[in-house]
């Protein structure tokens, strides 16, 4: 009996030993998997347990981990003392051995951060497990943020400026280029799309408006989310939304679906400007920030030039189209819409190779991720400069104390979409709270003044840049009307018309037994005329009307002479057979006017190149405020030259002049917006101000274009007053040149 009891006790003790050994090895393998980090940025591998044996079959090397006598006793006796119970001697590491990514909480007494600030067992400036009670939390976060700003600037200087920043520059430039393309797409396709989709004037106006509406919503939405979810992630999502719906819009046939796709395409691209500038600024040291953010602005100009060049090269080529029956038509303007999605697609592919902003990681307490990205920046630049041996010396980086914003979701909280709804509401509340913090007493004055500057700048710039082409078209129409030929009181009998009539007025004419076969009528008007025993076949017309005319025994076969083209006219015993299918509205289609739109836009966007270069070279020398105010004053002065624009060439020259001097103020405003707000509010504030910019653009376009053909005084007065007000407000803002990024 006793022998059986001893056997059972030995069996139980052996089972416990086996279980303990399995548990120990399982824990070690988990830790080993976590600590064996592949540094994807420097391509170096590190492992805490590189030389540790996983199995007793492979003895540890002579220089392996220290194993004390307690461990030998445990192996020999199968027991452990109270002093060593729960302690895994295999995890002891020699001093100086790599122990994974440096972490802020791993610093011991006497250790210091990169900027020299002491760090003793803290993370984000707070002791583990301790948080500042009550109102001390925000004060501590503010103090942490100030220390982080100084240290982050020091780290960026150590990382240097080189290949990494230039690579990111071109990647983000593609995203900014996509925004520049989006602004011009609808305006370029309207002359062609209006006939395919049979667009009335109100529909065309809504199509132009919907793009700005989508960009306004997208700027606010993605700007707010980028401060919570990350710059890179939100930019990838927003560009994906833009490219997907831009692709769909090139194939859809109906006006409603096309409008919907362009709306969502605008929502997607709306996040480009606020995220791109914030993202890039967080990789730039103070002495490089103003200049290189200004260089980045050039890609918006490149986007406009790309759109104008592609429209010029693609849309007039009718051979690039096909159709399947009468229901589906794919014309060349749809190819243009598809090509305009390429910058966004390429930006997505390139952005997947780039890391998240390390400043965003640090603001959200992710020390290890930030350290890895900064190490990548350092190693990339040092290798490019021929110094691969230089080691990234930073070991500890300040992080911001994180407030607990998590919500508890019970496991029985309905279905999965209800749980996602709760998370979405929580995220929305955080975004809204962050937006409201931009109006806190600390930032209220800056935000209100920036709203004024953004609104006035956008109101005048977009209003004038759209007013210029409209004025050019008006001058063309006036010149065209001045060359109209008038034929009064003509009498024509037994004549066949099979040629083109253009820009003519026929008054009091009489037409007997005449045939109009294969005739094209363009801007032709028949007034007080009589048509008797006439025959119209295969007639195509645009801007053609019959006013106060009489038709007797006349046949219309396969024509597009719809009812609205007969104004106060009588049709006696007349017949319409097999009218042409398609849009019954009178549209002009593509032609010389469309070419002029492409040409004017091409020159207008290309003209900002000198202003971009000058602003980039002087931004860090004269300061943001002087650049902004000076450019606004020059733009205001250039407005007064509009009174001399009495010809097409003069208006084109004035458009180029205004664009060239005003671009510097936009560059300065972008840099100023980035530097005035802290990292946790940067894209939120930028997105809100950019959304306000799009609202001002809609108002400016609506007001300025309403005066086309009426007066030039009102646009000159409105633009000058807005620019003067904006420059005066800008001078009251704080100068950010020479300051570290908050």
Swiss-Prot record:
The chain crosses the membrane at residues 170-190, 206-226, 234-254, 263-283, 295-315, 335-355, 448-468, 599-619, 627-647, 652-672, 686-708, 713-731. Residues 40-145 are annotated as: Disordered. Residues 122-137 have a biased composition (Gly residues). The keyword tRNA-binding does not apply. It is a multi-pass membrane protein. InterPro entries: LD_SV2, MFS, MFS_dom, MFS_sugar_transport-like, MFS_trans_sf, Sugar_transporter_CS, SV2. GO terms for biological process: chemical synaptic transmission; intracellular calcium ion homeostasis; synaptic vesicle priming. Residues 1-169, 227-233, 284-294, 356-447, 620-626, 673-685, 732-742 are cytoplasmic. GO terms for cellular component: cell-cell junction; endoplasmic reticulum; GABA-ergic synapse; glutamatergic synapse; neuromuscular junction; neuron projection; presynaptic active zone; synapse. GO terms for molecular function: protein kinase binding; transmembrane transporter activity. Its main location: other. Belongs to the major facilitator superfamily. This is Synaptic vesicle glycoprotein 2A. It comes from Mus musculus (Mouse). The lineage of its organism: Eukaryota, Metazoa, Chordata, Craniata, Vertebrata.
């Amino acid at each position: 009996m006793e022998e059986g009891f001893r056997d059972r006790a030995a069996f139980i003790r052996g089972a416990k030993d086996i279980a303990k050994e399995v548990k120990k090895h399982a824990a070690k393998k988990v830790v080993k998997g976590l600590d064996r980090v592949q540094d994807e940025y420097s391509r170096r591998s590190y492992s805490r347990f590189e030389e540790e044996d996983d199995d007793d079959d492979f003895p540890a090397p002579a220089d392996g981990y220290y194993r004390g006598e307690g461990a030998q006793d445990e192996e020999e006796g199968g027991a452990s003392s109270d002093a060593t119970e729960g302690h895994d001697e295999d995890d002891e590491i020699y001093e100086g051995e790599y122990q994974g990514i440096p972490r802020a909480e791993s610093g011991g007494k006497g250790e210091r951060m990169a900027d020299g600030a002491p760090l003793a067992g803290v993370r984000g400036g707070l002791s583990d497990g301790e948080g500042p009670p009550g109102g001390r939390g925000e004060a501590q976060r503010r103090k942490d943020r100030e220390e982080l700003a100084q240290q982050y600037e020091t780290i960026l200087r150590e990382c240097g400026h080189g290949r990494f920043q230039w690579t990111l520059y071109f990647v983000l430039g593609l995203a900014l280029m996509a925004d520049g393309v989006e602004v011009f797409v609808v305006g370029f396709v309207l002359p062609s799309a209006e006939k395919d989709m049979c667009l009335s004037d109100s529909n065309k106006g809504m199509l132009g408006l919907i793009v700005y509406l989508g960009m306004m919503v997208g700027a606010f939405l993605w700007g707010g989310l980028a401060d919570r979810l990350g710059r890179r992630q939100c930019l990838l999502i927003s560009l994906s939304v833009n490219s997907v719906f831009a692709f769909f819009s090139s194939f859809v046939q109906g006006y409603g679906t096309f409008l919907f796709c362009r709306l969502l395409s605008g929502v997607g691209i709306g996040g480009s400007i606020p995220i791109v500038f914030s993202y890039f600024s967080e990789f730039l040291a103070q002495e490089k920030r103003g200049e290189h953010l200004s260089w980045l602005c050039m890609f918006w100009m490149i986007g406009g030039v790309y759109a104008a060049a592609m429209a010029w090269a693609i849309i007039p080529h009718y051979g690039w189209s096909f159709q399947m029956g009468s229901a589906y038509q794919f014309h060349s303007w749809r190819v243009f819409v598809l090509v305009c999605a390429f910058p966004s697609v390429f930006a997505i592919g390139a952005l997947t190779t780039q890391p998240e902003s390390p400043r965003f990681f640090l603001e959200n307490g992710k020390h290890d991720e930030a350290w890895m990205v900064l190490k990548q920046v350092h190693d990339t630049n040092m290798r490019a400069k021929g110094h691969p041996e230089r080691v990234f010396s930073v070991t500890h980086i300040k992080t911001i104390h994180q407030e607990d914003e998590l919500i508890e979701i019970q496991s029985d909280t309905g279905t999965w979409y209800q749980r996602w709804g709760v998370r979405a509401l929580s995220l929305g509340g955080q975004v809204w709270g962050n937006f409201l913090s931009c109006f806190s007493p600390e930032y209220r004055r800056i935000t209100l003044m920036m709203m004024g500057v953004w609104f006035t700048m956008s109101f005048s710039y977009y209003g004038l840049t759209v007013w210029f082409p409209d004025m050019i078209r008006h001058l063309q129409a006036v010149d065209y009307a001045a060359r109209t030929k008038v034929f009064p009181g003509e009498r024509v009998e037994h004549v066949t018309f099979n040629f083109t009539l253009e820009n003519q007025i026929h008054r009091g004419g009489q037409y007997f037994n005449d045939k109009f076969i294969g005739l094209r009528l363009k801007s032709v008007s028949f007034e007080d005329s009589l048509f008797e025993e006439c025959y119209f076949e295969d007639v195509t017309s645009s801007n053609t009307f019959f006013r106060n005319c009489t038709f007797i025994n006349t046949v219309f076969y396969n024509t597009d002479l719809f009812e609205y083209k007969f104004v106060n006219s009588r049709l006696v015993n007349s017949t319409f057979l097999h009218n042409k299918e398609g849009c019954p509205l009178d549209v002009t289609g593509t032609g010389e006017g469309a070419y002029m739109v492409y040409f004017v836009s091409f020159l207008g966007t290309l003209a900002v190149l000198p202003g971009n270069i000058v602003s980039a070279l002087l931004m860090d020398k004269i300061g943001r405020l002087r650049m902004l105010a000076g450019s606004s004053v020059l733009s205001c002065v250039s407005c007064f030259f509009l009174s001399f624009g009495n010809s097409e060439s003069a208006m084109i020259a004035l458009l180029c002049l205004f664009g060239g001097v005003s671009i510097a103020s936009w560059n300065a405003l972008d840099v100023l917006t980035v530097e005035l707000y802290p990292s946790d509010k940067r894209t939120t504030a930028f997105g809100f101000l950019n959304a306000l910019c799009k609202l001002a653009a809609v108002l400016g376009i609506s007001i300025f274009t309403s005066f086309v053909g009426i007066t030039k005084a009102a646009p000159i007065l409105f633009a000058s007053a807005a620019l003067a007000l904006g420059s005066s407000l800008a001078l009251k803002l704080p100068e950010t040149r020479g300051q570290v990024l908050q």
